[in-house]
């Protein structure tokens, strides 16, 4: 008897998930494999995906258009949280996984599958994100992870697929692993595994090399409503269109590249290359607007929440009780985070050069050093005495 009768497989059309189809049937005795690909804004690469899945042995191949949900329900909350894992990575891939898990579980229920499967290896973070998310949504479903057990190198995986007529989208001489969605691209493997190796320009698609960027700066204005980006240069945009346009504009100025050594959940360090133009402007712009509209104590406390939020999303705990509790706090903080941020794009830099809001807590008459100054300087002496009183008492006690 096989490990499952009917399986819904998370499918990308790449090497690992394509090889999973014959592997599940030939090696694990699965009778029927239904593939499910999430349209997260990858672009043209999804066009032939049904045909490839069917040729690889799938009984049915599904594509779910979840672009709008991806941005509204996953990316936008992350922007409100200023989510940057290890203060650099805007979680483009990590944010997609709980959504894919959700539609996998829904498809399994619809088609009567007794298991779901994915092509994640045992060294990556995605296996955790898929397994934990699917378990949270339906703890009774079996989860199969062939790539975690088959023990094949990337070259061997490609060779296994070729035996079943599965073409590889990568060359054996340059086997980069690429994941792409509306929020950006992640590139790893191959020569990039050497951390001293400079990434070749050929791996980038969304961002221009500095030498090829415009010689004049471009200014953009991003409007936020309760922490959510809603306008670009004064024009209302739906969530997907806003991200798409920002990716194009920001990337054309060479902004949005990340080359980092990342601490994976499974305990190893990995070299990761990311392109994420829109998010690497939206998050700093949102944080800047918060500095104008949040009180100091809320702003400072939220920084710690943001770090925890980034970690639990990265670590696959999107559907956890802690995540839900943090969401409630973050949503409360966003009630007055409405306004506009002006950003200058030039030669690989995105510089915030202005911000304004009807909810601004910045008071010019109190901040100015000019003749309009209304700050009560005499009050400072009493404040300093009371503020420093514990230190004064400690110092007196310390001196005996």
From Swiss-Prot:
The protein's annotated pathway: Amino-acid biosynthesis; L-arginine biosynthesis; L-arginine from L-ornithine and carbamoyl phosphate: step 2/3
Catalytic activity field: L-citrulline + L-aspartate + ATP = 2-(N(omega)-L-arginino)succinate + AMP + diphosphate + H(+)
GO cellular component terms given for this protein: cytoplasm
Subunit structure: Homotetramer.
InterPro entries referenced in this protein's UniProt entry, alphabetically: Arginosuc_syn_C, Arginosuc_syn_N, Arginosuc_synth, Arginosuc_synth_CS, Arginosuc_synth_type_1_subfam, AS_cat/multimer_dom_body, Rossmann-like_a/b/a_fold
Lineage: Bacteria, Bacillati, Cyanobacteriota, Cyanophyceae, Nostocales
GO BP: argininosuccinate metabolic process; L-arginine biosynthetic process; urea cycle
Compartment(s): Cytoplasm
HAMAP family attached to this UniProt entry: Arg_succ_synth_type1 (MF_00005)
Coiled-coil region(s): none
The keyword Coiled coil belongs to this UniProt entry's keyword annotation: no
Pfam entry (one): Arginosuc_syn_C
The organism's place on the tree of life at top rank: Bacteria
Binding site for ATP: 10-18, 38, 119
Listed name of the protein: Argininosuccinate synthase
Entry EC no(s): 6.3.4.5
Residues reported to bind L-aspartate: 121, 125-126
Gene3D superfamilies: Argininosuccinate synthetase, chain A, domain 2, HUPs, Single helix bin
Family label: Belongs to the argininosuccinate synthase family. Type 1 subfamily.
The encoding gene: argG
Annotated keywords: Amino-acid biosynthesis, Arginine biosynthesis, ATP-binding, Cytoplasm, Ligase, Nucleotide-binding
Species this protein is from: Nostoc sp. (strain PCC 7120 / SAG 25.82 / UTEX 2576)
GO molecular function, one term: argininosuccinate synthase activity
Entry binding sites for L-citrulline: 89, 125, 129, 177, 186, 262, 274
């Amino acid at each position: 008897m096989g490990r499952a009768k009917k399986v819904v497989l998370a499918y990308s059309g790449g090497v690992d998930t394509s090889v999973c189809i014959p592997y599940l049937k030939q090696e694990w005795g699965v009778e029927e494999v239904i593939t499910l690909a999430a349209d997260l804004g990858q672009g043209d690469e999804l066009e032939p995906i049904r045909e490839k899945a069917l040729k690889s042995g799938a009984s049915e191949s599904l594509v779910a258009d979840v672009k709008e949900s991806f941005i509204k329900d996953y990316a936008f909350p992350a922007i409100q949280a200023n989510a940057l894992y290890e203060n650099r990575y805007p979680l483009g891939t990590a944010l997609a996984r709980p959504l894919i898990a959700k539609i996998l579980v829904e498809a399994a229920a619809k088609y009567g599958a007794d298991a779901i499967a994915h092509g994640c290896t045992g060294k990556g973070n995605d296996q955790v994100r898929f397994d934990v998310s699917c378990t949270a949504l339906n703890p009774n479903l079996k989860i199969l992870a062939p790539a975690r057990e088959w023990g094949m190198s990337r070259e061997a995986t490609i060779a296994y697929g070729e035996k079943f007529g599965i073409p590889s989208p990568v060359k054996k001489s340059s086997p980069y692993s690429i994941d792409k969605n509306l929020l950006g691209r992640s590139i790893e493997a191959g020569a990039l595994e050497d951390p001293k190796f400079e990434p070749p320009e050929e791996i980038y698609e969304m961002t221009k090399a500095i030498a090829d960027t415009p010689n004049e700066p471009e200014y953009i204005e991003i409007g936020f409503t309760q922490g959510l980006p809603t306008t670009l240069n004064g024009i209302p945009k739906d969530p997907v269109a806003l991200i798409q346009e920002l990716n194009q504009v920001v990337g054309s100025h060479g902004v949005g590249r990340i080359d980092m050594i990342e601490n994976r959940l499974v305990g190893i360090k990995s070299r990761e290359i990311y392109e994420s133009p829109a998010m690497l402007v939206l998050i700093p712009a949102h944080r800047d607007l918060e500095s104008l509209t949040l009180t100091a104590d809320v702003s400072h406390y939220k920084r710690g929440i943001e770090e925890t939020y980034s970690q639990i999303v990265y670590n696959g705990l999107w559907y956890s009780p802690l995540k839900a509790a943090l969401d409630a706090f973050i949503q409360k903080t966003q009630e007055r985070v409405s306004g506009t941020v002006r950003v200058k794009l030039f030669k690989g830099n995105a510089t915030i050069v202005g911000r304004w809001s009807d909810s601004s807590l910045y008071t010019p008459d109190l901040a100015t050093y000019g003749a309009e100054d209304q700050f009560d300087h005499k009050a400072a002496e009493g404040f300093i005495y009371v503020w420093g009183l514990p230190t004064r008492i400690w110092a007196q006690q310390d001196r005996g």
